Amino acid sequence: MKGIKAFTLAEVLITLGIIGVVAALTIPSLVQKYKEQATVTRVKKFYSAFSQAYTMAINENGTIDTWGLEDSEIDVDEDGNSGYSDSSLEQYEKFFNIIGKYLQKVEYEPIRNTRGKGFVMSDGTQIIAIWLQPSRCTGNGINHSDTYCGDFYIKTDNKPARKDDGTFNSNVFVFNINPYRIFPRGTDNTEFKDKCLSGTDMSRCTGWLILNENMDYLHCCLLYTSDAADD
């Protein structure tokens, strides 16, 4: 049509360049946000399913302190390496043999970089470690529902569970066990700040993820650490 000018090659290239810059700035952020939300969904799904299974196990078998379990122990081998004792690994398996039948599907198989075996849920979530302390877990009424009976760690992908310095990566989450329920670690404000926000133990971010349904703590750790160093 007369009176309408086409874009010049230079204008087209400039426009494409601007689009490319915007995409380069926004797409990584969108991908990261998507991955974080997928992790949130997986952890919350696990928490819901495992909580229900634990409740059913209690209803049929009594509280965990009556399951005939022994306290977990650490052994040190001749090279000075520490790890769960053989008896502790047996208790680990015994615990999940009881609770596993209340879950849709649990596979018991070797887990990379851990001694012995671990449990893998149907969606690939790995239960990589458990620490049982039934001797501290009395189950004496609902008023004692926060009694510590142990804790366990899950991993949401196949990336390493630990950083080079030995601390947990952000793909690891920890839950406490008490006589009547499980609950996420890191709901205590002091623990959340000292462990999660400082980056010294990312597994203690679990409480934030469950309560707030996001992983925004990943984007404020450096800021918190910097502020703490300035105090």
Model-derived features: where do they sit?
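Aliphatic-rich helix starts adjacent to a transmembrane/signal segment
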Residues: 29-50, 54
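N-terminal single-pass transmembrane signal-anchor helix
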Residues: 3-35
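Extracellular/mature segments of secreted proteins
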Residues: 145, 203-206, 212-214
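Conserved small/polar residues in nucleotide/adenosyl-binding loops
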Residues: 224-229
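Alpha-helix exit/C-cap motif
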Residues: 51-70
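Short amphipathic secondary-structure patches
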Residues: 69-118, 122-123
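Low-complexity, acidic interaction segments enriched in glycine
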Residues: 97, 104-179, 184
